[in-house]
Protein backbone atom coordinates (compact mmCIF):
# COMPACT_ATOMS: atom_id res chain seq x y z
CA UNK A 1 0.00 0.00 0.00
CA UNK A 2 1.30 3.43 -0.94
CA UNK A 3 -0.34 6.76 -0.12
CA UNK A 4 0.56 10.06 -1.78
CA UNK A 5 -1.01 13.35 -0.71
CA UNK A 6 -1.61 15.27 -3.94
CA UNK A 7 -3.39 18.33 -2.55
CA UNK A 8 -4.61 19.87 0.69
CA UNK A 9 -6.54 23.06 1.44
CA UNK A 10 -4.53 25.56 3.51
CA UNK A 11 -5.67 25.96 7.12
CA UNK A 12 -6.17 29.66 6.45
CA UNK A 13 -9.17 28.83 4.22
CA UNK A 14 -10.87 26.94 7.05
CA UNK A 15 -10.10 29.65 9.60
CA UNK A 16 -11.41 32.33 7.22
CA UNK A 17 -14.64 30.36 6.76
CA UNK A 18 -14.98 29.97 10.53
CA UNK A 19 -14.27 33.64 11.20
CA UNK A 20 -16.93 34.58 8.66
CA UNK A 21 -19.52 33.57 11.25
CA UNK A 22 -18.27 36.17 13.76
CA UNK A 23 -16.62 38.57 11.29
CA UNK A 24 -13.45 38.27 13.38
CA UNK A 25 -10.98 38.36 10.50
CA UNK A 26 -8.70 40.84 12.27
CA UNK A 27 -7.92 38.16 14.88
CA UNK A 28 -6.56 35.70 12.34
CA UNK A 29 -2.90 34.89 11.73
CA UNK A 30 -2.96 33.27 8.27
CA UNK A 31 -3.23 29.68 9.47
CA UNK A 32 -0.93 30.16 12.45
CA UNK A 33 -1.42 29.16 16.07
CA UNK A 34 -4.42 31.44 16.63
CA UNK A 35 -6.21 30.03 13.62
CA UNK A 36 -5.33 26.45 14.57
CA UNK A 37 -6.76 27.02 18.05
CA UNK A 38 -9.94 28.42 16.50
CA UNK A 39 -10.33 25.47 14.12
CA UNK A 40 -9.84 22.99 16.96
CA UNK A 41 -12.15 24.82 19.34
CA UNK A 42 -15.02 25.39 16.91
CA UNK A 43 -14.69 22.28 14.73
CA UNK A 44 -13.70 19.72 17.37
CA UNK A 45 -14.52 20.92 20.88
CA UNK A 46 -17.77 22.75 20.03
CA UNK A 47 -18.67 20.17 17.35
CA UNK A 48 -19.48 22.75 14.66
CA UNK A 49 -17.96 20.24 12.26
CA UNK A 50 -19.42 21.85 9.13
CA UNK A 51 -16.58 24.38 9.38
CA UNK A 52 -14.14 21.52 8.76
CA UNK A 53 -15.76 20.74 5.42
CA UNK A 54 -13.83 23.67 3.92
CA UNK A 55 -10.66 21.56 4.23
CA UNK A 56 -10.19 19.06 1.42
CA UNK A 57 -7.51 16.45 0.85
CA UNK A 58 -6.71 14.53 -2.32
CA UNK A 59 -4.83 11.25 -1.94
CA UNK A 60 -3.43 8.85 -4.52
CA UNK A 61 -3.94 5.39 -3.01
CA UNK A 62 -2.08 2.47 -4.61
CA UNK A 63 -2.02 -1.23 -3.85
CA UNK A 64 -5.23 -1.84 -1.93
CA UNK A 65 -7.48 -4.80 -2.66
CA UNK A 66 -10.87 -4.57 -4.30
CA UNK A 67 -12.26 -5.90 -1.01
CA UNK A 68 -10.81 -2.85 0.74
CA UNK A 69 -12.08 -0.60 -2.04
CA UNK A 70 -15.63 -1.78 -1.32
CA UNK A 71 -15.20 -0.71 2.30
CA UNK A 72 -13.91 2.72 1.22
CA UNK A 73 -16.87 3.15 -1.14
CA UNK A 74 -19.31 2.92 1.76
CA UNK A 75 -18.17 6.29 3.06
CA UNK A 76 -20.19 9.29 1.95
CA UNK A 77 -18.99 12.72 0.83
CA UNK A 78 -15.93 11.41 -0.95
CA UNK A 79 -14.94 11.65 -4.61
CA UNK A 80 -13.14 8.49 -5.79
CA UNK A 81 -11.68 7.94 -9.25
CA UNK A 82 -10.78 4.25 -9.50
CA UNK A 83 -8.48 2.31 -11.83
CA UNK A 84 -10.79 0.79 -14.44
CA UNK A 85 -10.67 -2.97 -14.92
CA UNK A 86 -12.42 -2.47 -18.26
CA UNK A 87 -9.31 -0.79 -19.65
CA UNK A 88 -6.49 -2.22 -17.54
CA UNK A 89 -7.08 -5.97 -17.11
CA UNK A 90 -5.10 -6.53 -20.29
CA UNK A 91 -2.01 -6.04 -18.10
CA UNK A 92 -2.34 -9.75 -17.23
CA UNK A 93 -2.35 -11.08 -20.79
CA UNK A 94 1.41 -11.26 -21.20
CA UNK A 95 2.10 -12.72 -17.77
CA UNK A 96 3.45 -16.24 -17.26
CA UNK A 97 1.51 -18.81 -15.25
CA UNK A 98 0.79 -17.90 -11.63
CA UNK A 99 1.71 -20.94 -9.57
CA UNK A 100 0.28 -22.04 -6.24
CA UNK A 101 2.69 -21.20 -3.43
CA UNK A 102 4.55 -18.50 -5.38
CA UNK A 103 3.37 -15.67 -3.16
CA UNK A 104 6.10 -13.23 -4.15
CA UNK A 105 5.13 -13.30 -7.81
CA UNK A 106 1.39 -13.16 -7.10
CA UNK A 107 1.83 -10.22 -4.74
CA UNK A 108 2.46 -7.99 -7.76
CA UNK A 109 -1.27 -8.26 -8.45
CA UNK A 110 -2.81 -9.47 -5.20
CA UNK A 111 -3.05 -8.24 -1.62
CA UNK A 112 -2.17 -11.34 0.39
CA UNK A 113 -3.73 -11.82 3.81
CA UNK A 114 -1.16 -14.17 5.33
CA UNK A 115 -3.44 -17.21 5.43
CA UNK A 116 -1.80 -19.75 3.14
CA UNK A 117 -5.01 -21.51 2.15
CA UNK A 118 -6.82 -18.26 1.34
CA UNK A 119 -3.83 -16.78 -0.48
CA UNK A 120 -3.42 -19.90 -2.62
CA UNK A 121 -7.12 -19.73 -3.49
CA UNK A 122 -6.55 -16.14 -4.62
CA UNK A 123 -3.59 -17.24 -6.75
CA UNK A 124 -5.75 -19.93 -8.35
CA UNK A 125 -8.41 -17.33 -9.15
CA UNK A 126 -5.74 -15.03 -10.60
CA UNK A 127 -4.46 -17.81 -12.84
CA UNK A 128 -8.01 -18.61 -13.96
CA UNK A 129 -8.43 -14.95 -14.90
CA UNK A 130 -5.12 -14.90 -16.78
CA UNK A 131 -6.20 -17.97 -18.74
CA UNK A 132 -9.55 -16.41 -19.63
CA UNK A 133 -7.80 -13.27 -20.85
CA UNK A 134 -5.86 -15.38 -23.36
CA UNK A 135 -9.17 -16.02 -25.11
CA UNK A 136 -11.34 -13.62 -27.09
CA UNK A 137 -13.46 -12.67 -24.09
CA UNK A 138 -14.09 -8.98 -23.52
CA UNK A 139 -12.62 -7.38 -20.41
CA UNK A 140 -16.13 -6.33 -19.36
CA UNK A 141 -17.08 -10.00 -19.07
CA UNK A 142 -13.73 -11.35 -17.87
CA UNK A 143 -13.70 -9.01 -14.86
CA UNK A 144 -16.57 -10.96 -13.30
CA UNK A 145 -14.07 -13.57 -12.11
CA UNK A 146 -11.71 -11.06 -10.50
CA UNK A 147 -10.56 -12.17 -7.04
CA UNK A 148 -11.46 -9.76 -4.24
CA UNK A 149 -7.77 -9.59 -3.37
CA UNK A 150 -6.86 -8.08 -6.77
CA UNK A 151 -4.92 -4.85 -6.36
CA UNK A 152 -6.37 -1.56 -7.48
CA UNK A 153 -5.69 2.13 -7.02
CA UNK A 154 -7.68 5.32 -6.80
CA UNK A 155 -7.47 9.06 -6.39
CA UNK A 156 -9.66 10.04 -3.46
CA UNK A 157 -10.79 13.53 -2.46
CA UNK A 158 -12.35 13.85 0.98
CA UNK A 159 -13.12 16.74 3.32
CA UNK A 160 -11.83 16.91 6.88
CA UNK A 161 -15.17 16.15 8.48
CA UNK A 162 -15.60 12.98 6.44
CA UNK A 163 -11.97 12.03 7.00
CA UNK A 164 -12.49 12.33 10.76
CA UNK A 165 -15.38 9.88 10.45
CA UNK A 166 -13.31 7.55 8.29
CA UNK A 167 -10.34 7.50 10.67
CA UNK A 168 -12.56 7.13 13.73
CA UNK A 169 -14.39 4.10 12.32
CA UNK A 170 -11.60 2.46 10.36
CA UNK A 171 -8.64 2.76 12.75
CA UNK A 172 -10.54 0.60 15.25
CA UNK A 173 -9.34 -2.98 15.76
CA UNK A 174 -12.86 -4.11 14.81
CA UNK A 175 -12.30 -2.81 11.26
CA UNK A 176 -10.95 -4.93 8.41
CA UNK A 177 -7.17 -5.16 8.90
CA UNK A 178 -6.41 -3.68 5.48
CA UNK A 179 -8.66 -0.64 5.82
CA UNK A 180 -7.30 -0.15 9.34
CA UNK A 181 -3.84 0.11 7.81
CA UNK A 182 -5.26 2.51 5.24
CA UNK A 183 -6.83 4.76 7.89
CA UNK A 184 -3.53 5.04 9.72
CA UNK A 185 -1.61 5.58 6.48
CA UNK A 186 -3.95 8.42 5.47
CA UNK A 187 -3.36 10.09 8.83
CA UNK A 188 0.41 9.74 8.45
CA UNK A 189 0.25 11.25 4.95
CA UNK A 190 -1.43 14.42 6.21
CA UNK A 191 0.61 17.62 6.55
CA UNK A 192 2.04 17.82 10.08
CA UNK A 193 0.23 21.10 10.75
CA UNK A 194 -3.14 19.45 9.96
CA UNK A 195 -2.80 16.37 12.17
CA UNK A 196 -4.19 18.10 15.28
CA UNK A 197 -7.62 18.01 13.63
CA UNK A 198 -7.60 14.20 13.49
CA UNK A 199 -5.49 12.99 16.43
CA UNK A 200 -8.51 12.42 18.68
CA UNK A 201 -10.07 10.17 16.01
CA UNK A 202 -7.24 7.63 16.02
CA UNK A 203 -7.84 4.45 17.99
CA UNK A 204 -4.92 3.45 20.20
CA UNK A 205 -6.07 -0.15 20.60
CA UNK A 206 -4.27 -1.54 17.58
CA UNK A 207 -2.27 -4.65 18.44
Swiss-Prot record:
* Keyword Glycosyltransferase included in the entry's annotation: no
The species is Campylobacter jejuni subsp. jejuni serotype O:2 (strain ATCC 700819 / NCTC 11168)
**Name recorded for this polypeptide:** Flavin-dependent thymidylate synthase
- Quick check: keyword Transmembrane in the entry? no
Give the residues annotated as active site: 170
Residues annotated as binding FAD are 50, 74-76, 159-161, 165
Q: Which NCBIfam families match?
A: thyX
EC primary class: transferase
Q: Which reaction does it catalyse?
A: dUMP + (6R)-5,10-methylene-5,6,7,8-tetrahydrofolate + NADPH + H(+) = dTMP + (6S)-5,6,7,8-tetrahydrofolate + NADP(+)
- BP term (GO), one: dTTP biosynthetic process
Pathway(s) per entry = Pyrimidine metabolism; dTTP biosynthesis
Q: What gene does the UniProt entry assign to this protein?
A: thyX
Every ThyX domain range: 1-204
The family note in this entry says: Belongs to the thymidylate synthase ThyX family.
Q: What does this protein do?
A: Catalyzes the reductive methylation of 2'-deoxyuridine-5'-monophosphate (dUMP) to 2'-deoxythymidine-5'-monophosphate (dTMP) while utilizing 5,10-methylenetetrahydrofolate (mTHF) as the methyl donor, and NADPH and FADH(2) as the reductant.
List residues binding dUMP.
Answer: 71-74, 84-86, 143, 170
Q: Quote the cofactor binding remark.
A: Binds 4 FAD per tetramer. Each FAD binding site is formed by three monomers.
The UniProt entry annotates the motif ThyX motif at 74-84
Amino acid sequence: MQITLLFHTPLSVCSHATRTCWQSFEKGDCGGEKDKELIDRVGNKFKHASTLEHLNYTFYIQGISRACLQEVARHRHTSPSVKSTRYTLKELRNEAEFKIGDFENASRYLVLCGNEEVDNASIKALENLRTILQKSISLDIAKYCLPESYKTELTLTINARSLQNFISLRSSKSALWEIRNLANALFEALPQEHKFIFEHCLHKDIE
